[in-house]
Amino acid sequence: MKNIPTIVRNLGTINIRNNVGFSSVPDQVRESSMVKGFELNVLVVGRRGLGTSTLINSIFAAPLVDKKRTNNITATRNEIVENDISLEISIVTYHEANISPVLDYINAMNREYFDNEQGLYKAFKDNRVHVCLYLLPSDTLTDQEIKNMYELSQSCNLVPIIPKADMYTPDELADVKENVRQILSENNIFSFVPYLNENDGDLTEEVADIVGCMPFAVIASETMYEHGGEIIRGRKYPWGFINIDQEESNDFKRLQRLLIYTNLDELTMKTNHLFYNNYRKKIFEIENDCGAMKEARYLRLRTETIRILNDKYESRINALRKEEEEMERFYSEKIREMNDKMGEISKQVEKSLHVE
């Protein structure tokens, strides 16, 4: 397996003081997950300078991503604990234009999981990518970036993100969102959309709100401010203050809920049932094709070997025949010479008898 990065930033177990939501997931999520904890593997792709580290560290209320990381694949793996419930969180970042290394990484993690499934030990870490946050630039998307999103959407749950939403007016932001939706539709890019179950009670309204606001436009901040008598995460400007948790101003809270509250289990299940199963199917098809190719090659080699042996056998038979013919000629010649000699002797004897 190639392009598997080493863990460059491991903070171990982090007990967070500001709840992010995974310890109070809905009843629809398996009870066993509440006991054993949760796993989430997040891939973040996009140009450098769009606020990846600030966004991720804000979502999980922990310093998971280092601002000094490289543009190549960088992985962090940690455990964060909220109200005695743990979340095993893996963050992989990548900021180059060519996403071949990312696709190789996704396939390598799928292959690792596949190999572990075939082994004796069934308890192993799930390192497959559960969701990809694709950070969109404020200027025009390039053809390469559109292609990148399409290819990623074929391999994992893609969630396009409009970062730094505070640089737009409400009307501008509405236009940006509509433009992104149009690009996704025109290029057959299927982003992750939560399943809306009308029988989920209050959760139905919450999920409907999340779906209606996609693609998400977010504002992130790791800084806490005292504002209006409260300690709030937000951003200060000359003209005022933005509380990033306020859903009227941006979709940060909706994105956070999607990842670690309302749809955490759906992301992992879709990874397993759709993307990973597609990968397994390809592996089996390749192995079957390889088996057929090996069988065909074996038959060709066997046929060729028999032909060579037959050719050698026929050549040997011909050589023996030739040798036999030569021996036949040799003995025939010797017999002829002997007969001639015997005839000559007989003539001489007969002649001597006449003389006497």
UniProtKB/Swiss-Prot annotation:
Keywords: Cell cycle, Cell division, GTP-binding, Nucleotide-binding. The keyword Nucleotide-binding applies. Residues 36-286 form the Septin-type G domain. Septins are GTPases involved in cytokinesis. The septins localize to the site of cleavage and act as a structural scaffold that recruits different components involved in diverse processes at specific stages during the cell cycle. Septins are also involved in cell morphogenesis, chitin deposition, cell cycle regulation, cell compartmentalization and spore wall formation. Belongs to the TRAFAC class TrmE-Era-EngA-EngB-Septin-like GTPase superfamily. Septin GTPase family. Component of the septin complex. This is Cell division control protein 10. It comes from Encephalitozoon cuniculi (strain GB-M1) (Microsporidian parasite). The lineage of its organism: Eukaryota, Fungi, Fungi incertae sedis, Microsporidia, Unikaryonidae.
